[in-house]
Amino acid sequence: MKINLSMRELVSRLSTTLKTAIALSVLTACTANDSVSLTSNISNTSGVLLESQTKITDGALHFDGKKLNHNTFENPSKSQAYDYFFGRNISAHGDAVKPYKHFVFMTWYKGGKEERNVMLSRFNTKTGVVKTIQFPHRHTGFRGDPLVGESHNTIGLAVSPLNGTIHMVYDMHAYVDDDETGRFKGRFVDDFFRYSFSVAGAADVPDDEFTLEQFVKDTSELSQGADDYKHLTMTGNLQDKENFSALTYPKFYTSDDGELLHYMRWGGNNNGAYYFNKYDAKNQKWTRFTPFNHKDQKTHGNAYNWGLYGQMKYINGKLRVGFQQRSANNDDRFKYQNGVYYAYSDHPDGLGNWKNVDGEDMTWPLVNSDEIKIFEPGDYIDHTAPNSVHIVTGFDWTVTENDDVHFITHVRSTDTKRSDYKEVSIHAFKPANAVDFTITTDFTGADSIYTSGDSIFIIGLKNGYPFVEKAKGGSNDFEVVYQQASGVKFDHGTIHIENGKAYYYLMEKGAGNALPLHLQVIDLGVTE
């Protein structure tokens, strides 16, 4: 595989953006408590438009206190402010929104600091009703301290189109059984994995029947009581519990055949693996986890251990993996991540036939990440000293229905005060029939990249308002096709794309640790 480098003139890019901006729709302010539909009186030739905006709740959990570190986390504030570790966001964060038939399901944590319950809302687009279930479980906080919020403890969500069951995995960050001498001080003994699921057909029940009674209680020997809806394994077999230990970042996908797939990261930041499993809708049972790559790679002959920062995705009919590596080698030039790595499986369940981007067989489970490396973003900064290159934010990837492969990433100097400081955003893409990747730095950067049909999209917030940029798959020709200009301002959100629509699940800007959540449904003007 070769790599081509391209750089378009910045003036050309600005000119295109300005022309597009002239034609943008100016949206009416959206302040209603319930679902509303918004239209534009200005022609939008892109076909991108906001279908509706719906308030889901007035009080979702948000961390509004101080950011703590390893020196301060044992002394959090006992006042109303909610101190946190890592990031502020835990609601409208992660794998938290999924459409199913004429419903949209959303997970969140209840605010404020003293509440923290796991919540599940269902928006019925036919009746306009938002019905919410409150679960007994409360966010446990960083390493089990409820006074320290933990942004990694997101709630993964799925609905099976084959039997209407609802599945949630939540509130964990590499938790394990340990004792008072361990990292978690014995706080997660037989409670290190949290899985809740419903009876068959629960996703379809009438609004007044969408209640906690649709979910299955844990009646095993490890049950924590009559109101325990948490299950320690997804298989239903407690003998499998070690297979569900030390996991983080739940994410669900639905295959083209309606099968549910689920993956998580096993291990830690610089020594981890992607584990995935599958739901058998007929028997209503999940498989054990299967590794994409080995953890503890040194024990398998690699020169060093490494972790993954990216995602496993089921997209365009295949299970795929794209990530950046965080090496346990602390003496190289990379402070955190490096590289762009990618693989896909020709097996419908990912159980073999794994290949690199060129279609060549790779070792499975993977040990040496170089087998699937595409390029090195760190080469775009001329630093060689240990830990001088900083790669953390702005990485994502997607594959269009035409099989165009796209990666975005961001690299900068670790020392922001050095005289030769450099910062670069990169877009690497390979059209379906191309042999080589094109890599361009004529890219403004983004947190995520999405696809629908043969198009690619960058969707995010600008000054608190949603925007959409669109380009044809296999190109870098992004144009702004949608920009909200008024209404509710948002702090952050998470997005799910399905059937040509973006389900943008958003938290409203505000003060305190209990803030409103909204759902925007944006038609992307794509026929799938």
UniProtKB/Swiss-Prot annotation:
Family indicated by similarity: Belongs to the polysaccharide lyase 24 family.
Q: Where is this gene product found?
A: Secreted; Cell membrane
Lipid-carrying residues in chain (S-diacylglycerol cysteine)? C30
Put simply, this protein is called Ulvan lyase, short isoform
- Identify which residues the record assigns to the active site: H152
Q: Which organism is it from?
A: Alteromonas sp. (strain LOR)
Sequence positions that bind Ca(2+) 1:
D218, D228, K230
Query: Chief subcellular site?
Result: secreted
Say yes or no: keyword DNA-binding present. no
Q: Where does Ca(2+) 2 bind?
A: N329, D332, F334
| Role noted for this protein | Ulvan lyase involved in ulvan degradation. Ulvan is the main polysaccharide component of the Ulvales (green seaweed) cell wall. It is composed of disaccharide building blocks comprising 3-sulfated rhamnose (Rha3S) linked to D-glucuronic acid (GlcA), L-iduronic acid (IduA), or D-xylose (Xyl). Ulvan lyase catalyzes preferentially the endolytic cleavage of the glycosidic bond between Rha3S and the uronic acid GlcA, but not IduA, producing oligosaccharides that have unsaturated 4-deoxy-L-threo-hex-4-enopyranosiduronic acid (deltaUA) at the non-reducing end.
- Record field: temperature dependence: Optimum temperature is 40 degrees Celsius.
Q: Which UniProt keywords apply?
A: Calcium, Cell membrane, Lipoprotein, Lyase, Membrane, Metal-binding, Palmitate, Secreted, Signal
Signal peptide, first to last residue: 1-29
Q: Name one GO molecular function term.
A: metal ion binding
In the bilayer, the protein is annotated as: Lipid-anchor
Q: Where is this site: Neutralizes the sugar carboxylate group at subsite +1?
A: R265
What EC identifiers does the entry list? 4.2.2.-
A single Gene Ontology CC annotation of this entry is:
plasma membrane
- How is the activity of this protein governed by pH, according to its UniProt record? Optimum pH is 8.
**Which enzyme class?**
lyase
For the lipid attachment N-palmitoyl cysteine, which residues are annotated? Answer: C30
Q: What does the entry list as the binding residues for substrate? A: S151, H152, Y309, R326, H390
